[in-house]
Amino acid sequence: TLDEADRRVLEAMLKQAAEEKATAKKNKALAKKYYKQFFSSENADNMKLVFYSEGSGYYKYFKNLIEAILEKSDITIHYVTSDPNDAIFKKNEKQIIPYYVDENRLISLMMKLECNIVVMTTPDLEKYHIKRSKVKRNIEYIYLDHGCSSLNLTYRTGALDYFNTIFAVSREQAIEVREIEKLRGTKKKKIVEYGYGLIDTMIKDYEASGKPVNEKKTILIAPSWQYDNIMDSCLDDLVEGLYGRGYK
């Protein structure tokens, strides 16, 4: 027989499982509704521009570009997200139409696109579940990087091969794209030296903040992704060495 503690744990697990099942059912119905809306007859002749986002946290990489489109044009943005709780659904902007699509429907949605342009921060187009459209072959696929590092050092081989246009965060990255094309023998892409909107936003927000001076200096530890980075190799010693020195 279960003792009281075990019984409570079991009840909590069963409750969590039931909640997860209910949420999954709700999200499945939501995805079905948005998928149907996306391919509605109303959209068929009017859909020009599609953004794809992996989740709510990715909007910040699109933000500056989207705001420029809203300010300078009347183009409707069809914003597809894999996150049912994406903050995009709370935006009251008539030029943005958001859709939640689950992973299974995302595969067919991408293959059936008939828009003119797709913008995404997700690399590896055509290599995994996200494919170019099989219905309209001349869609322009734009890759907008969500980092500001080396494409060659951080992505898989061929991660950008199937994009038509790269929004480069720097001139160095633009040069790197050309060198990758030469090395792999792939077709030349359009390159737009776009910069990195997230940093632009951070600078703007800082300038508007009045530049407050913190009483304590804050140390930001930012490990890289490679093997034996700070987190794996020396984090404990590093943090211990900073104790009691007046830092936050």
Residue ranges and their predicted role:
Residues 1-50, 71:
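Non-catalytic N-terminal targeting/anchoring module and adjacent flexible stem/linker
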Residues 10-14, 28, 32-36, 87-90, ...:
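Generic detector of well-ordered alpha-helical segments enriched in charged/polar residues
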Residues 32-34, 141-147, 209:
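Short, functional N-terminal and low-complexity linear motifs
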Residues 38-44, 150-155, 214-216:
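Short amphipathic alpha-helical segments, especially helix-boundary/capping motifs
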Residues 43, 135, 160, 212-213:
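Short, flexible hinge/linker loops that cap or flank conserved catalytic cores
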Residues 45-49, 139, 216-219:
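Nucleotide donor/acceptor-binding cores
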Residues 50-203:
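Active-site and donor-binding regions of nucleotide-sugar-utilizing enzymes
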Residues 58-74, 197-248:
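Conserved catalytic-core segment of nucleotide-activated headgroup transferases in glycan assembly
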